[in-house]
Amino acid sequence: MPTIGFHAQHEQAHPRDLRDSAVHAEQAGFDAVMCSDHLAPWSRRQGHSGLTFAWLGAALQATERVPMGCFHAPGQRYHPVISAQAFATLAAMFPGRFPWVALGSGEALNEHVTGDPWPTKDVRMARLRECVDVMRALWRGEEVSHRGLVTVDRARVWSLPDEPPKLVAGAVSAETAAWAAEWADGLITVNQPPDLLRRVAGAYRDAGGRGELHLQVHLSWARDDDAALAAACETWRSNCLPTSLAWELETPEQFEAATRHVPPEE
């Protein structure tokens, strides 16, 4: 049986309201909750972007049973030692209820704030791979030093869970899915035409990928189709951009400019 979860979209709601939505999702019978991890929304109309670490602690405390996971991009805005410590703390405080983190190479929208250069995709993927090794070593209780695309000097995470979260790969393309198969504990991707989804999942499995497959499905709910379409156009035009462009834009204003003329049917 598939697990049907609720996506807590930080970019669209005040953190307090989003916490309450997670409670309502559990009460309504959803099997899980996941959330985004952005510093900025994709548009000013969306209007919010709470801190995932803080929100997850509050949401896990406010609910009773549903497991939760999140997207995350270590390596620039987040140092992997801080990522490892934060997720270890959540997993230790809520045993069995923080089972996975979905890792990606990030977007300039969130990462440019450090002032560091925004790397090319291949460098970001290599940096992510280093972060995976650093985080897992810390969760094994090791003291870690590392010199590469990220630097770590004698770090240790002292409060560890009995079971650390799985590191799931976020991938949109078949190429990235195949690359992630070597290290990932599972795969998460987003809704695309069925033939593309089969290619992504097949590439992951063919490359030896293990674990569960997760699919994030975007939908717009309203009392009639016209209202649902209007709501989607108002807040989610950014979904129409190719990922190769979306990764590079740095501000909500740039996303708005790039999608200003997207027609509703797209």
Summary of predicted features, one role per range:
Residues 1-266:
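Active-site-adjacent structural elements that line small-molecule/cofactor binding pockets in enzymes
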